[in-house]
């Protein structure tokens, strides 16, 4: 199973007590049922594929990202706190965190493997450390 420098930085940045269980579970993962599908032309066009059945999370990752970002350029541009369900590849949240008006981006996810994938793909360490990005594994609270 792969582990990147991004993952190590993100785990180190998850320093609060609220991340104790999630960090432990992420570090103990032994098998992944997903892999990345990269587009050599555009890194934003990154998909996640289920290894067992070949299903992709996105039909058109780049187009779906651009559509998802659009409301945050207009009507939600100044929202200080925004909530989402589903981490996907994480690129949407990395993009939204560029807007300093978004003081908190809270992401609920029920699949720990997808959290693992996103934390390996992108460096969220600064946002995790300062609390601008909050990742919640739903099963920790149900």
Language-model segments: what does each one mean?
Residues 1-142:
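N-terminal donor/sugar-recognition subdomains of glycan-related enzymes
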């Amino acid at each position: 199973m792969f582990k990147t420098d991004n993952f190590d930085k993100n785990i180190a940045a998850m320093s609060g007590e609220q991340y104790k269980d999630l960090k432990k579970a992420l570090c103990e993962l032994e098998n992944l049922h997903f892999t990345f599908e990269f587009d050599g032309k555009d890194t934003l066009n990154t998909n996640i594929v289920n290894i067992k059945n070949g299903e992709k999370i996105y039909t058109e990752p780049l187009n779906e990202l651009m559509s998802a970002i659009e409301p945050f350029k207009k009507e939600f541009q100044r929202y200080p706190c925004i909530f989402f369900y589903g981490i996907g590849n994480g690129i949407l949240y990395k993009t939204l965190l560029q807007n300093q008006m978004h003081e908190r981006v809270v992401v609920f996810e029920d699949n720990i493997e997808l959290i693992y994938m996103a934390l390996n793909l992108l460096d969220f360490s600064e946002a995790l450390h300062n609390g601008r990005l909050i990742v919640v594994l739903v099963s920790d609270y149900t």
